[in-house]
Amino acid sequence: MSMQDPIADMFTRIRNAQGANKVTVKMPSSKQKVAIAQVLKEEGFITGYSAESTVKPELEVELKYFEGKPVIETIERVSRPGLRIYKKRNELPNVMGGLGIAVVSTSKGLMTDRAARQAGLGGEIIGYVA
């Protein structure tokens, strides 16, 4: 059976792994998932990640905890296959008053809402992380 929304699956795997206090979580890999993991690492939400290109490419995400609690409080999918959400540069959301990030897919690649605003770009809102 094919997966309908791989990004939502990635977010769910991260959410479930943190709920079970796992150190790492593995999932099928894709270029977009690796780009999302890179954004999460740059923003300090995960410790790191590694992408293995074997017969079945796998992405392993190293989760981050602070004083025993997960750093990622909420991670949710916004734009989905059945309802794409696009925003112009001046309409990009401020997640939790600037404490969280919105992952935005722009013409220059995946970036945070802050980086997209600075670059003057809008795009598809992939999800919110806080």
Curated annotation (Swiss-Prot):
This is Small ribosomal subunit protein uS8. Belongs to the universal ribosomal protein uS8 family. Keywords: Ribonucleoprotein, Ribosomal protein, RNA-binding, rRNA-binding. GO terms for molecular function: rRNA binding; structural constituent of ribosome. One of its GO terms (cellular component) is ribosome. Part of the 30S ribosomal subunit. Contacts proteins S5 and S12. GO terms for biological process: translation. The keyword Hydrolase does not apply. One of the primary rRNA binding proteins, it binds directly to 16S rRNA central domain where it helps coordinate assembly of the platform of the 30S subunit. HAMAP family: Ribosomal_uS8_B. The gene is rpsH. The keyword Ribonucleoprotein applies. InterPro entries: Ribosomal_uS8, Ribosomal_uS8_CS, Ribosomal_uS8_sf. SUPFAM superfamilies: Ribosomal protein S8. Pfam families: Ribosomal_S8.
